[in-house]
Amino acid sequence: RWYYHCDKLGIIVWQDMVNGGGAYPMWYVTYLTNALQPLMRRAPDGKLLWGFLGRGSVHSREEYARELADTVAALGRHPCIGCWVPFNEGWGQFDARKATETLRALDPSRPVDEASGWFDRGGGDVHSIHNYFYPLRIRPNVRTVVLSEYGGIAWPMPGHEPPRKTYGYGTARSRAELTERYCDLQRKTVLPQLKKGLSALVYTQLTDVEDEVNGLFTYDRTAIKPDAAAVRAVNEALEVEFEKAVKE
């Protein structure tokens, strides 16, 4: 039903495959990979790395192949599906090029974001960047360059906090500070990169969730956290600049 509503509303879905495999050592998959990028992300794509990413067993890799095919069969008829994403941030990632080849054989009509985040192998149609901590530098690429995760500024709005921990990528102390930091991020970090080939943005994130309070809306979906007019204005400025970049 969710995909049906996306079809009706015109919401484009970038569809991840279900995470799987064994346990992920977070010290490697998340912390070390972030701290030592891009060095760690250039690790050879072989069985040693697959083991660190939870895909050490043949059975697990075969199960992924079945689930990938089943996912395309189940969802491929929905017009809302705009892009397939075999792997996100290394979770259960292995042989990414082969996954892309399989997806293109199953559905040649849609682009593939081969590895959203960490372990980019140069394949697929999208160079997919997750960046929360480092200067953003977009370089020319034969693939579409997408900032597919960024931002994540936390602010637990009083009276609307989720029931669990309140995680984010940096914390604001008030609505005013959240608004200021969001607008500065868009104007000073993102906007200058549009002329360099940055083609799409995915802000983290639309709403607060159980473990994170970095949404633009509260966990209960009843309030917008930053100043709506300021957010709209800076987003419209990005849109204008993007249109200029396309025409150039």
Question: Which ranges hold each PLM region?
Answer:
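Substrate-binding/catalytic cleft of secreted carbohydrate-active enzymes
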Residues: R1-T222, P226-A229, N235, E241-K244
